[in-house]
């Protein structure tokens, strides 16, 4: 839960299911009795990765990851871009599981508070908010953004992602069977999805790549066209990252046999993407 200093007290708010009850202080509207019955899980705060949020399905304004209904979510990542407008601040938050996620925080124009301060790019943050979709583009509308000073909190968040979704999947699965969710967590975290085993993310448990390298490899894998992904598109998807760093990573992945060029030296496909 959020502590009195505006930070996030990660451990104490976890329930037996690995996810957190939404305190009244989060500003969520009180549900009606009907909503309580039909959407019993939607008031939980669910720890997620960006990849999970981007792949969440939507039906009648309700988002789900597998059988888990989402309303309030938590992600942890690094701010790649920050842009302040009169009424809101738009961030791009990158947890290295997919392209950076748009996070919008509305500001109080009537008073100068810490909520109105822009978190600078390069800072790690923990974001709590609501998943939204507009014109088929998902984003998070944040009601709390707190800086992360200890990188152990990033590791802890990924473990919470694994634990909470395992528990909620097992609770929602039919007797005698279970649904499996690909968590798609950063490769160096060693977090997989096979019954909770720590087996490495992104369908490549022992590739030995860094999170940055895995992120670029997964973006290239996601392109199903015969021509592969253009380097220009890769730059656009990784907005805020240093272009030279992207180029060096692409060259490394090519030299190591993870990707190959297609129609020219600016288009790439994964060697195991078919």
UniProtKB/Swiss-Prot annotation:
GO terms for molecular function: damaged DNA binding; single-stranded DNA binding; telomeric DNA binding. GO terms for cellular component: chromatin; chromosome, telomeric region; DNA replication factor A complex; nucleus; PML body; site of double-strand break. It is found in: Nucleus; Nucleus, PML body. The keyword Phosphoprotein applies. Disulfide bonds: none annotated. Keywords: DNA damage, DNA recombination, DNA repair, DNA replication, DNA-binding, Nucleus, Phosphoprotein. Residues 7-27 have a biased composition (Gly residues). Residues 1-42 are annotated as: Disordered. Residues 73-147 bind DNA. InterPro entries: NA-bd_OB-fold, RFA2-like, Rfa2/RPA32, RPA_C, WH-like_DNA-bd_sf, WH_DNA-bd_sf. GO terms for biological process: base-excision repair; DNA replication; DNA replication checkpoint signaling; double-strand break repair via homologous recombination; mismatch repair; nucleotide-excision repair; protein localization to chromosome; regulation of DNA damage checkpoint. It comes from the Eukaryota. It holds the Pfam family RPA_C. Differentially phosphorylated throughout the cell cycle, becoming phosphorylated at the G1-S transition and dephosphorylated in late mitosis. Phosphorylation increases upon replication fork stalling. As part of the heterotrimeric replication protein A complex (RPA/RP-A), binds and stabilizes single-stranded DNA intermediates, that form during DNA replication or upon DNA stress. It prevents their reannealing and in parallel, recruits and activates different proteins and complexes involved in DNA metabolism. Thereby, it plays an essential role both in DNA replication and the cellular response to DNA damage. Belongs to the replication factor A protein 2 family. PANTHER family: REPLICATION PROTEIN A-RELATED (PTHR13989), REPLICATION PROTEIN A2 (PTHR13989:SF16). Component of the replication protein A complex (RPA/RP-A), a heterotrimeric complex composed of RPA1, RPA2 and RPA3. This is Replication protein A 32 kDa subunit-B.
